């Protein structure tokens, strides 16, 4: 089985700021991390590989050349190789254009199962995974928080919605999107890091390699654009009380009722 995990390099949201004049994210000097939902997807793929050693795991991303470092992290964790889509033509792609490029790359690389994170923390659209499945014309299951069973023919997963859990069995090939809460990603392994130093395991593809019409990707191929980005202003307000235990309990209960957190 061949599993391709889609990843995105995103700015660390704990240190992100916004240019108030342009409304754009300030990325200069901000540490880049692997999107958390995507890391969970990689861990899920590696757990399948742990049980079925013949499984091949490939990490794939579209981005700037520096995104290769993220792919190397994935290989160091246990993936077999990384694939980087990088080209100026691809710059400025929205989710629609991104899915076109990723679908073309997936067709070129080959796959049985595609795992993507539910959404990226720098956009929160949750669109790329489903759109890529649509481009490929294959089934998709989103919001997966557990892989129950997988074989050469199908995969069975559990997905959690607001008030219900669903068990879904779907034929391969397919796309699933994963939640960061589903597992704890493993650390990079020393042996894998040494192997990376000996052998280049990152393949780079340009738009020419993909054979995609340049007018369908990048700014030209993007029907949507971000008008503005902003961060919510948070103000801290602290009040100090010196009360007895009973008075404290009464005050907490009153406050919770006022905020309609409790009703009785």
What are these regions (language model features)?
Residues 1-264:
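N-terminal glycine-rich FAD/FM-binding segment characteristic of electron-transfer flavoproteins
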């Amino acid at each position: 089985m061949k599993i391709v995990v889609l990843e995105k390099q995103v700015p660390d949201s704990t240190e992100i700021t916004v240019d108030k004049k342009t409304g754009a994210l300030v990325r200069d000097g901000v540490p880049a991390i692997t999107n958390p939902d995507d890391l969970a997807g990689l861990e899920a793929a590696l757990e399948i590989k742990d049980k079925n050693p013949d499984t091949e795991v490939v990490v794939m991303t579209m981005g700037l050349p520096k995104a290769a470092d993220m792919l190397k992290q994935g290989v160091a964790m246990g993936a077999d190789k990384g694939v980087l889509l990088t080209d100026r033509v691809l710059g400025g792609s929205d989710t629609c254009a991104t899915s076109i490029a990723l679908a073309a790359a997936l067709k070129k690389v080959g796959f049985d199962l595609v795992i993507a994170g539910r959404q990226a923390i720098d956009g929160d659209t949750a669109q790329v995974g489903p759109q890529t499945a649509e481009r490929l014309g294959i089934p998709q299951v989103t919001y997966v928080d557990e892989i129950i069973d997988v074989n050469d023919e199908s995969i069975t997963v559990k997905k959690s919605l607001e008030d219900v859990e669903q068990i879904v069995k779907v034929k391969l090939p397919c796309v699933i999107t994963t939640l960061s809460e589903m597992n704890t990603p493993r650390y990079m392994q020393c042996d894998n890091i040494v192997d990376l130093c000996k052998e280049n395991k990152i393949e780079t593809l340009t738009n020419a390699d993909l054979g995609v019409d340049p007018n369908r990707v990048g700014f030209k191929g993007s029907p949507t654009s971000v008008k503005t980005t902003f961060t919510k202003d948070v103000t801290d307000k602290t009040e100090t009380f010196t009360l007895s235990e009973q008075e404290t309990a009464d005050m907490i209960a009153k406050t919770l009722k006022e905020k309609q957190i409790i009703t009785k």
